[in-house]
Amino acid sequence: MGRALLLLVLLAACAPLPEGPGLPYPGGFVRGSVVEGRFQAILPGAPLLVDADAEALYAAYPYQLLEVRAGKVQSLPLPGVPRFLRARPGLAVGLEGGVLTPRGLLPYPAQDALETPEGLYWVDAEGLHLEGRLLLPGSFRQVVAWEGEVVALGTEAHFFPSGRRLALPAPALKAQAARCGVAFLAEGGLAHLLTPTGLTPLGPAEDLAAWEDTLYLSPGERTLRCGGGP
């Protein structure tokens, strides 16, 4: 597996760079197989999903997860095609049969999930769950950890455990936590920044990511700083 992966990486490095919009991750963009920004690497191909924590970038493919750490690429097997990928607080990969975490495959039908020291928070059409316990009823698509709270997003944003809630302009399709709030992409192609006091529109986007004080949006490989400005 290691020699085959090395060959794929070398072949990708020799191939022409593919055209297309950059895929944002927390700290930069992946354009085709080329990782730019906070991490630097050549992947064997364009990933389906990408995310990162403070120390590693994860790129998900059918039946394979690549970890880029300290300039090295490691291949990890996946028992299926990934449906979602979360690197923070802990690694969680959504699959048809459950959620893969460092603790193993957990049999929850999640649309999104967070691996935390308290356990796996996950969301679906019934609500926000912690492992096998329903915490909040509702229909949610995204869940992030922000400022000591778990934020579940659907047509509304619910903050747990404080109980605060805010209506969203459209259902959330993707969300990531930044230092200044929760950046999310809504149906209709508009990005917003969510805080407990309200919403700030960020403009049109098809994908987004967040790291510390910076938001990454595509297409156009745009970056925004918390508080406004590039």
Identify the role of each PLM range.
Residues 48-51, 57-72, 86:
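Post-signal peptide N-terminal segment of secreted/secretory-pathway proteins
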Residues 2-7:
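Sec-dependent signal peptide recognition
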Residues 31, 59, 93-94, 122, ...:
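Residue position within the beta-strands of beta-propeller blades
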Residues 32-43, 64-77, 97-109, 125-137, ...:
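Surface-exposed loop/turn elements that mediate protein-protein interactions on large endomembrane-trafficking
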Residues 17-26, 45-54, 80-88, 108-118, ...:
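Repeated scaffold domains used in trafficking and secretory/extracellular systems
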Residues 12-13:
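C-terminal motif of bacterial Sec signal peptides marking the signal peptidase cleavage site
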